[in-house]
Amino acid sequence: MTFGRGRRHVGRTLVFAVHVFGLSVSASARAVDESGTDVQALLDENIVTTASKSLETGTAAPATSTSITAEDLRRYGIHSLDEAINFLSLGVVTANPLRDPDIGSRGVLVTGDHGNHILLLINGHAVNEPLYGSAQFGRGMGVPLEMIDHLEVVIGPGSVLYGSSAMFGVINVITKRAKDFAGTHVIAETEVGKSYRVAGGAGYQFGHETELTLAIGYYAQKGPSFTFGPQNFGVDDVSGAPIVTTYKGPATGIWSGTAHNSYYSYVPEAVLRFSSGNLEVNLRGATYKRSAPYAAYLSPVPGDFDYPDNYDLDRSASADIAYRVRPTAVLDLAARVYGDTFDTQRIYTVSASSNCIYRGNTSPCLYHWTGTSQWVGTELQGSFNWLQDSSLVTLVGADVRVVSVQAKQDVQNADTLAYHESSTNVIPIGNDKVEEVLGAYLQQTWTPAPFIALNAGARIDASERYDPVISPRFAANLAAWRGGTIKLIYAEAFRAPSWNEAQSSNVNLLTAESLRPERVRSVEAVLEQKLGAQRVLFGVFRSWWTDLIDLHRLTTQEYIDLAAQEKLPSLLSFSAQQYRNITSIDNFGFNARFEGSFLGNKAHYALNATSAFTSRVDDEYGASHPPAVTPQMFGNARIAYEFGERYPVIGLAAHFVGKRPAARTFEKYVPQIAHFDPYRFAKFPYVEPQLELRLTVSGPVPVVPGLSYRASLDYAFSDEAPYIVGRPVDNHNVRTSPTAQFAPVDRFRGTVGLQYDFLP
Amino acid sequence: MLVGAATSSLLARRAAAESIAVPIRLQAELLAKMASYDRNFQARTGERVRTLLLTKLGDPESARAGAEMKTALASIPSIGGLPHDEELASYADAAALADICRARKVSILYVAPGFSQQVDTMREAVSELSLLTVGSLADYVPNGIVLGFDLVSGRSKLLVNLTQARRQQIDFRAEVLKLTRVYE
């Protein structure tokens, strides 16, 4: 297979982007004469803090970033972080397997990674937990939307100041200050027939220096129902009869039907932000229970079809206390202590005998994975503003963290809940239950002249689980001409192996040995041009990813070698896998953005586009191939018009993703048997492009002061998501279906909501 | 060392509530643009714009903001189309401030952080002068500083005290007033 078509598509879209750039500059040049547009242009500058841990404009920041305002979230009917990313951000995209969204950036996405290649911050507090490295980017994020002041989406490697997981970039969710959330607020919203959400919040100032904002919310979703075509799982190895695919159901071997009960989620969430003088306290807590009607990633035997008690449950809470002070005009000091707790459960009932091999038992088995992690840490930071005018600033910091992780798997009789055996897959292995992680960073910024700014820094991260990792970044920002800025950026980032990857084991998984951190290097050149109230960004990038951790299927020779070394576990299947550093990715492409306002600042628009050519080399497929699920062309467009303070705002947003291979497309299923066609699919399954449109109307309810509404309609043109339902081969590796069935898409959605503000 | 410094700083008197929310460089650019939308600016200023950057003695936040604003304004070719000079000054009292503004023909007064308690008296002292007062903090504007900057949802916002603007003979054009949050 060749991928020349991909290179041509990058070329065509590059030509289109350059054309749009030219048109926009021309249009902007005309707009510059309008009175007030020069002031408007400055007011439209994003103010960011994430890229360099200092207050600066987006143009001056040493990275490409998008700032998404609370106003944008409301105007365009956004309900969750993944929707904000898809409809409003540049360079980042999510895909929805009906469970937790996968997230990727600039043409790279790792399916089923629990979001561990992008760092999620809430008010600067890192949320990714150590067991899986996971963070939630959908409804499970745990912050009521009305509490969000703005989102900063920084793309490209960001470990220089933040350490592990910032490979795709960093997303910082900034919550509102009391002045912007003044009073008490009550919100009720429903996606008609599918979900509802209620939330309340308040923001109060006490005197000149003290303030409190808090919000709580509850989201519940059930449905819609999806119908799945027949998936033939074949004959059960144990019973000799067709596999049972429904709870205590008949032995048909066929997994199919309409799932009415197994697609739901429930999210209670609460956040609090308190500040008094130099002290700031952030607290957050959320639980996220969800069930998906199918397994997005391959299981040898399916969970019982439409069984409502198969679910995942995450619970998380965090506390972050920060104190900042400026003892002299040169020095800023900040100290922060933080603590997090996270636990997860996965409950999974299976009636197939081959997954429930316990003598004398005929009841279904209940698989119960549990994992917990807690971590506490402190970060100390000093900023030296040597000339007191921010032209020469040294930032130095250290972050020390202690991590504790535990996990296990139990198998129970689903009827009596009696345990079938001792816990397996126990993490941590051995007695070393605590990990100490040290991160230290240094960043130097220098503005030798008003038209040039330089930023160089590096962070070192060390832990007993891996060799020290250094993540440097160099950036130059050149104000090349009036309104024009050129940025040149080189950055590296890493991801530490999660505890799950490093230590988990079961009958199908051999414990990993000596996993190294994943690495990425990236170079980027970005041109930003402001002309009047319009802004254009065009950037090209290239990145190299090495040592990515993936599952390697053991070969026959490896089984023989393990046996010879007496390392072969007593219970290990003949299709067992092992986490290894086996995958590399090479990619290049461009990001383009065109945004601004017109009609006296009443109309706002933006167009974001990303195109990439990505080549992945992995253990399974061997030769280079595009990464699964990841669109190589994606973007969004939006326009909104404000009719006036007492009238509605109408917003139309569109999200586009190009054709892409489905998850598991390039996996083999029996690589150790030479005469079998090793791929699961007779033809590689590609999902057609998707276009999603959302129309939103919002504004104050006439006659009732304090009451406002928001209503949106959402339509997706394609009914296919890039995930495979079931399996195209049966339990005996016989191909039963020539084509793949793609996961469904909830194509039409309507949402209405009301908010009442009790103003002080 | 950092731990010790952080601990000792617990006694520091500066409050984060008076921290800058909008980058100084952007404040300087907005100030320069806004000046050109004041109909009386050229008449008041003459041939050269003189900006006084007022800082509070012994206040590190204030000192740094003043120094940074001086550098930022110096890099801007013109303010309201005119050449310009900037000068740092420490606040003594309101009467002395008014005298300095008169004596040095100051046309823009930039008030660095640290003056939340003095803004009222400052307002009374300069009310009779034809002078654009600019606050580094949003809190200053409702209390009598003509122009200020706030951060709302990751974007800067201009604040204008229109009553005080009229008193100080500042006449912003409607094109920019509609972009601001107006206090009357």
Describe the function of each predicted region.
Chain B
Residues 2-184:
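Short hydrophobic alpha-helices and adjacent helix-cap/hinge residues
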